[in-house]
């Protein structure tokens, strides 16, 4: 033991002596260069800064940003930087799969799940499931089989096996949610079309990764070493991986809701759990070989409605901003690195393979969409029209998911350079050509766009009434449809789930707070209309009496009122005689009633913005509507003179005022 201590002190003495000699020989230095200590983080920060500045510049260049999506412009910036680095003989950077799947992809998928309009997704769950599962399987085998058939005639410069080309066809079938959101948010398509394309793109990625991992395992094992049991296990893994990822997401969503429920005394920790637990869901699913994309997407979708009741409004807004910031930063870096990697990566250019891949991607997606929509239209009340099917076929944009998967192909697959080149070519074609031309096509085909107004209070109420009425009709008919499922879930949610996962929630058999609030507003509106009708009848009676030359009898209470009426009373009387002012008062009292009922139903402190306008909405469809309303507001501001609601010379109806108000409750 003593000998070991002696050796340890001897090593420490030698090390200290060496450091002392270096300090003495070099002397004291005012500045020391420590680039090796910070260069990794510094390079990442510089790339993020360049990408963010480029995005600001694009928004300032209105003629260009109007027609070109930000994703295509960021790819151009990456191409330019890659060319500069190549010409100056500097080492370029590439987007490796480890960085992409562990650091850049999780914020994007969490953002997509957290801001997913859950009601619209559930109403179209059947079509989203068909497109994302069966559509992906169809594209994978159709593209792979066609390319394999062409390879039998030696049309390509590199050879590949059956499972190797299925690996490529699986990754090239991945519709990228980043590219879809970037394009479809800007063209303001209707909710029905948006949720089907966006929902397919989100869950299609999870299915794609499952197929990719399965075929990659088959390729590494070798077709000659596979048995029937291996094929059966691989097919079973498709369902196990997908459903297991969903189960992981549900577990961590419950954990996030429960932890935020008990952070009332330490509110600063609530956002920590909101971001850490979904990321842990992603890592946990990845660790046990389940679908990490489905896990974090499901976690974000389920936890949203519960954590909002456990945190303050200020914290909820902070979560929205930070989620958007992370997702936007990741998207920006990914698209720029796609352009940069084009110059840095090793390529094998095969024109026939690229053209064949692009052709099969377009034609088989169109065939799959048409066939699936034909089958779905036979069982759906809301049909897919031909123009909807065309936009869905044309909107299958490829992006970072496909590139992240292709660069993670094992080096043992000899055709990997050809696959990388073909993937980049398909991404460029879809992002540039299809992304730029989809807006003119939407305008040319007159696709129904998102309405530039929020639903009125009456529309929201009667939509809710319709849900309960249809649930009753299904119950009477003895059929269990999705309206019955909605009612049962809402009752179970209000009675069991919310009291467990949310603070200040009592066990109720029915959650009717939104209907009560809306009914109070309808009652107020009816009272205002009744007062206006009585006022008009009295005015017409007085005019008829005056026209006949008779003097209307003055009652004693009116005489006393006229004698004691002050100038302020006369001003108020003239103000109330105007129907326009009655409308404005209704709007004022309606908003006050909403605020008071909201405070009664939500005892927690709510902090609102100064201007009352959220620039980040609760889901993507609200985001699209907000942008439309904002542009409409600016157009109306430029056309109308500045007038107050009480003194403008233009008549405003109650319906117009209601149309500009925000909806009171979520249908």
From Swiss-Prot:
Segments for region (Disordered): 637-667
Main location: membrane
GO cellular component terms listed in the entry, alphabetical order: membrane; plasma membrane
Residues of this chain annotated as glycosylated in UniProt: 310
GO biological process, one term: regulation of intracellular pH
Compartments where found: Cell membrane
Superkingdom per UniProt: Eukaryota
Post-translational modification Phosphothreonine, affected residues: 644
Role description: Serves some physiological function other than regulation of cellular pH.
Listed name of the protein: Probable Na(+)/H(+) antiporter nhx-9
Annotated organism of origin: Caenorhabditis elegans
């Amino acid at each position: 033991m003593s000998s070991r201590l002696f050796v340890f002190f001897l090593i420490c003495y030698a090390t200290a002596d060496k450091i002392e000699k270096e300090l003495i020989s070099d002397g004291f230095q005012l500045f020391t260069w420590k680039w090796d200590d910070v260069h990794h983080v510094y390079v990442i920060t510089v790339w993020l800064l360049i990408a963010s500045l480029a995005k600001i510049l694009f928004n300032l260049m209105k003629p260009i940003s109007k027609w070109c999506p930000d994703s295509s412009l960021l790819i151009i910036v990456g191409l330019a930087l890659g060319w500069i680095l190549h010409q100056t003989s500097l080492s370029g950077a590439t987007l490796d799969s480890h960085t992409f799947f562990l650091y850049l992809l999780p914020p994007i998928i969490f953002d997509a799940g957290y801001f997913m309009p859950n009601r619209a997704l559930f109403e179209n769950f059947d079509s989203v499931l068909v497109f994302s599962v069966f559509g992906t399987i169809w594209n994978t085998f159709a593209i792979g089989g066609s390319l394999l058939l062409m390879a039998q005639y030696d049309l390509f410069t590199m050879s590949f096996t059956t499972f190797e080309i299925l690996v490529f066809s699986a990754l090239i079938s991945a519709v990228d949610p980043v590219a879809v959101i970037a394009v479809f948010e800007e063209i303001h398509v209707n909710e029905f079309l948006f949720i089907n394309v966006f929902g397919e793109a989100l869950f299609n990625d999870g299915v794609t990764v499952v197929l990719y991992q399965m075929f990659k395992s088959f390729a590494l094992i070798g077709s000659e070493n596979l048995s029937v049991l291996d094929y059966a296990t691989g097919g079973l893994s498709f369902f196990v991986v997908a459903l297991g990822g969903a189960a992981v997401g549900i577990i961590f969503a419950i954990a996030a809701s429960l932890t935020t429920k008990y952070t009332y005394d330490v509110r600063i920790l609530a956002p920590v759990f909101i971001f850490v637990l979904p990321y842990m869901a992603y890592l946990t699913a990845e660790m046990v070989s389940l679908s990490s994309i489905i896990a974090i997407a499901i976690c974000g979708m389920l936890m949203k409605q519960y954590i909002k009741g456990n945190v303050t409004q200020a914290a909820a807004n902070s979560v929205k901003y930070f989620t958007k910031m992370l997702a936007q930063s990741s998207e920006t870096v990914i698209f720029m690195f796609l352009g940069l990697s084009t110059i840095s990566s090793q390529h094998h250019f095969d024109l026939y393979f690229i053209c064949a891949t692009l052709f099969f991607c377009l034609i088989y997606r169109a065939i799959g969409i048409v066939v699936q929509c034909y089958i779905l239209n036979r069982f759906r009340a809301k049909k897919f029209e031909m123009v909807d099917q065309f936009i869905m076929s044309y909107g299958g944009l490829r992006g970072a998911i496909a590139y992240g998967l292709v660069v993670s192909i094992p080096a043992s697959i000899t055709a990997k350079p050809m696959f990388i080149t073909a993937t980049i070519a398909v991404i460029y074609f879809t992002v540039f050509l299809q992304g730029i031309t989809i807006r003119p096509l939407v305008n040319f085909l007159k696709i129904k766009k998102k309405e530039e107004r929020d639903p009125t209070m009456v529309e929201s109420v009667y939509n809710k009434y319709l849900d309960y009425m249809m649930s009753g009709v299904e119950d009477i008919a003895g059929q269990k449809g999705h309206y019955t499922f909605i009612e049962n879930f809402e009752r179970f949610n209000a009675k069991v789930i919310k009291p467990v996962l949310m603070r200040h929630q009592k066990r109720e058999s029915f959650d009717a707070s939104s209907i009560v609030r809306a009914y109070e507003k309808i009652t107020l509106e009816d009272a205002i209309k009744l007062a206006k009708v009585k006022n008009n009848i009295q005015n017409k009676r007085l005019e008829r009496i005056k026209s006949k030359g008779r003097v209307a009898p003055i009652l004693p209470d009116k005489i006393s009122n006229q004698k004691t009426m002050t100038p302020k009373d006369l001003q108020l009387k003239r103000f109330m005689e105007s129907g326009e002012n009655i409308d404005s008062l209704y709007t004022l009292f309606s908003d006050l009633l909403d605020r008071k009922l909201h405070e009664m139903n939500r005892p927690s402190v709510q902090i609102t913005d100064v201007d009352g306008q959220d620039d980040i909405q609760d889901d993507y469809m609200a985001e699209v509507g907000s942008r439309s309303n904002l542009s409409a507001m600016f157009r109306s501001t430029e056309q109308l003179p500045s007038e107050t609601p009480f003194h403008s010379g233009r008549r405003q109806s109650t319906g117009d005022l209601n149309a500009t108000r925000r909806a009171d409750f979520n249908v």
